[in-house]
Design a protein with these regions (language model features):
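Hydrophobic alpha-helical transmembrane segments
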Residues: 22-85, 255-261, 274-294, 337-344
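Membrane-proximal transmembrane or re-entrant/amphipathic helices at the cytosolic face
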Residues: 322-356
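Interfacial/gating helices of multi-pass transporter permease domains
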Residues: 59-63, 99-103, 107, 125-149, ...
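Interhelical loop/hinge segments that connect adjacent transmembrane helices in multipass membrane
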Residues: 47-65, 69, 78-118, 161, ...
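Residue-level signature of transmembrane alpha-helical cores of multipass secondary-active transporters
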Residues: 21, 25, 66-70, 74, ...
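Helix-loop interface residues and adjacent transmembrane-helix termini in multi-pass membrane transporters
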Residues: 14-15, 59-60, 132, 169, ...
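Membrane-interface junctions at transmembrane-helix termini in multi-pass inner-membrane proteins
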Residues: 2-26, 85-88, 225-256, 298
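Specific pore-lining/lateral-gate transmembrane helices of multi-pass inner-membrane transport
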Residues: 140-254
Length: 356
């Protein structure tokens, strides 16, 4: 079902109907969440009261309820999309199909490599730690990794919005300058998120990590955030191979990133424990970002203002690491740094807007 609605969702993004896109996505999540609450909380309540619904007789394992909720939400989304299918119509074009396959197959390979980057840190932690500790350490690591959700949400929203924008401007003679400006905006805001989360992490931990036993693992958070920032920059820098139909480069870069993930985890976890896994993720995404930049500037030069971008990234990273690892995490000092960064970001964004 999710595959069948991929093209309609892409059409909404391409046509700039971001509100409609968001409405459907939020509706899907709301239905899914509501059904999970119904199945996993209300149904057991009814069962304890002696009520048995027909659906309860068909489900033997509670995990089946999760699958069922997802299936119903996806089915409703597909039904909602049906009028769009009728409006667009169907036309089989073998030449277009070949072009789509040539473009999309490397993206599929890149997606597999991305899954390696995202999941193998836990695999290696479990493999390299003693069996008696592995489950507890993976739980601690995964619990603290959730603090990267702020950067992840920003990157996801950015990627969903920026890719249709990149393609719609590909034919414009000023496209490289536009891409450079968008990347500068991303760098400024992503740097702000990095600093903000690092400064207020002792407040966020109460919300996202209720298990106090996991708090000792918060030391991984700056590297998780920096890794996600590098991933976001990679998505922005990867415009060159997407708009020029050279997606095989995306597969190559992602596979290299997967290789870095494997080697770095095997090397660093025995030295630094689960902290090594977070550093490995940062090295993998950082390597992919730099590789995409290096190759891209030779294949499709874009005039990125690296002096300004680098200044904000260095400022944000330096302040975040110093506050988190060197200082005593004084909230007043951290808040002053956040306000100072916000002021500089405001001035820079205002200046970039006024540039022609």
């Amino acid at each position: 079902m999710d595959t069948l609605v991929a093209i309609p969702f892409a059409w909404y993004r391409y046509s700039g109907q971001s509100l409609h896109y968001a409405f459907i996505k939020i509706g899907n999540v709301t239905v899914n969440l509501g059904l999970n609450l119904l199945f996993l909380l209300y149904f057991p309540f009814l069962e304890n009261k002696g009520y048995r619904l027909p659906l309860m007789e068909l489900v033997s394992d509670k995990t089946q309820y999760i699958f069922l909720a997802n299936l119903i939400a996806s089915l409703l989304t597909f039904i909602y999309m049906l009028p769009l299918y009728k409006r667009i119509g169907f036309l089989w074009d073998i030449a277009l199909w070949k072009r789509l396959f040539q473009y999309a197959f490397p993206v599929l390979i890149a997606g597999i490599a991305f899954s390696i980057n995202e999941a193998f840190d836990r695999v290696f932690i479990r493999m390299l730690y003693p069996a008696s500790l592995a489950d507890a350490v993976v739980g601690l690591y995964a619990g603290c990794y959730k603090m990267g959700v702020f950067m992840t949400l920003f990157i996801t929203a950015y990627k969903l919005g920026v890719e249709p924008f990149f393609f719609s401007n590909a034919a414009d003679k000023n496209a490289p300058q536009t891409y450079a400006k968008v990347t500068e905006y991303f760098s400024i805001f992503a740097g702000g998120i990095l600093l903000f989360v690092c400064v207020y992490i002792d407040l966020f931990k109460w919300l996202l990590i209720p298990n106090r036993a996991y708090w000792e693992g918060l030391k991984i958070v700056p590297f998780v955030l920096m890794a996600n920032l590098c991933l976001g920059l990679y998505h922005s820098l990867s415009v060159w191979y997407k708009v020029t139909d050279r997606t095989h480069w995306g597969a190559i870069i992602s596979l290299i990133g997967g290789g870095i993930t494997i080697v770095a985890n095997l090397s660093l976890i025995p030295l630094w424990g689960y902290m090594g896994a977070a550093v490995a993720t940062f090295l993998a995404y950082g390597g992919m970002m730099l590789l995409s930049l290096w190759i891209g500037q030779r294949k499709y030069p874009i005039p990125y203002p690296w002096q300004r971008i680098g200044s904000f990234l260095l400022l944000s990273t330096g302040l975040s690491l110093a506050y988190f690892y060197i200082g005593d995490r004084n909230l007043f000092v951290g808040s002053t740094a956040v306000v100072g960064y916000a002021f500089l970001a405001y001035k820079s964004v205002k200046r970039v807007k006024n540039e022609k």
